[in-house]
């Protein structure tokens, strides 16, 4: 089997390192000339929206996946016309946009911090009046490793915050006094069979994941599996999905999902 991967970075590389011993071959589409995964398969150097090269990739492989959620959903939708793509374009559309993501959690009855859509400074002012401070403002898309977000602690932080984050669509989330952050990684096949990994406790340094410690018998494992299972079923998901939670008062509140392989699986 030959697998096409959108993105040739560290996660694509680790995906290939795991798949090669199983007899799988890989092709990576990535605009970077030094994409680190290229030593493990064919490197198609092209932008993610380059339809000619996307079609080339589709013609060469049996199926396509992606290593990170910053890939445009339109890219996945285009590829889906010619080759199976997992996870689906709809899964990516929701997971890459915090508003769609949080709205799905709410619809599925999964606890998540209070949130509001922000399209202007006036929206932000109204949301702060409703949700209160402290709160966290995040861009709806493209934020990662602490980027694309700002903590608002006092009224002076609110003025100009929308412009500070680039005057792009954002969400405002109520601040969560959490005791820890945990993540659960699940895998769901095309036949619906699902497997869950042990719940992992994550430690961050300046917004970047620095340490993940797995638990063999975490008291919140079953609850996390229930919440993740709801999302997998809703999206008819195929592939690997990571779900990050805040631990709050003996329960869990949803933070975000990642529709891909995840660094929290590299744990001790």
Question: Where are the predicted features?
Answer:
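ATP-binding N-terminal substructure of ATP-dependent carboxylate-amine bond-forming enzymes
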Residues: 1-100, 107, 122
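Anionic group-transfer/hydrolysis microenvironments
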Residues: 32, 69, 140, 175, ...
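Active-site nucleotide/adenylate-binding loops and adjacent lid/helix of ATP-dependent enzymes
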Residues: 94-183, 187-234
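Conserved metal-phosphate-binding beta-hairpin within the catalytic cores
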Residues: 236-264
């Amino acid at each position: 089997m030959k697998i096409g991967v959108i993105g040739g970075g560290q996660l694509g590389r680790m995906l290939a390192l795991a798949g090669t011993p199983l007899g799988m071959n890989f092709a990576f589409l990535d605009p970077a000339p030094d994409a680190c995964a290229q030593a493990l398969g064919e490197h198609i150097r092209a932008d993610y929206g380059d339809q000619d090269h996307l079609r080339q990739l589709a013609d060469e492989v049996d199926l396509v996946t992606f290593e990170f959620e910053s890939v445009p959903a339109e890219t996945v939708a285009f590829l889906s016309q010619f080759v199976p793509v997992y996870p689906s374009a709809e899964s990516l559309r929701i997971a890459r946009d915090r508003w769609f993501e949080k709205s799905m959690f709410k619809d599925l009855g999964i606890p998540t911090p209070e949130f509001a859509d922000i399209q202007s400074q006036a929206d932000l002012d109204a949301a702060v009046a409703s949700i209160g401070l402290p709160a966290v403002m995040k861009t709806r898309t493209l934020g990662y490793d602490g980027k694309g977000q700002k903590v608002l602690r006092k009224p002076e932080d609110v003025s100009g915050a929308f412009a500070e984050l680039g005057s792009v669509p954002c969400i405002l989330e109520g601040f969560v006094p959490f005791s820890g952050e945990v993540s659960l990684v699940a895998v769901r096949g095309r036949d619906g069979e699902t497997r869950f990994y042990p719940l992992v406790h994550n430690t961050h340094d300046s917004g970047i994941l620095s340490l993940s410690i797995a638990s063999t018998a975490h008291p919140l494992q079953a609850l996390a599996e229930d919440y993740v299972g709801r999302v997998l079923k809703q999206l008819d998901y195929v592939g690997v999905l990571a779900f990050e939670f805040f631990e709050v008062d003996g329960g869990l509140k949803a933070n975000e999902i990642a529709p891909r392989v995840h660094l929290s699986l590299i744990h001790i």
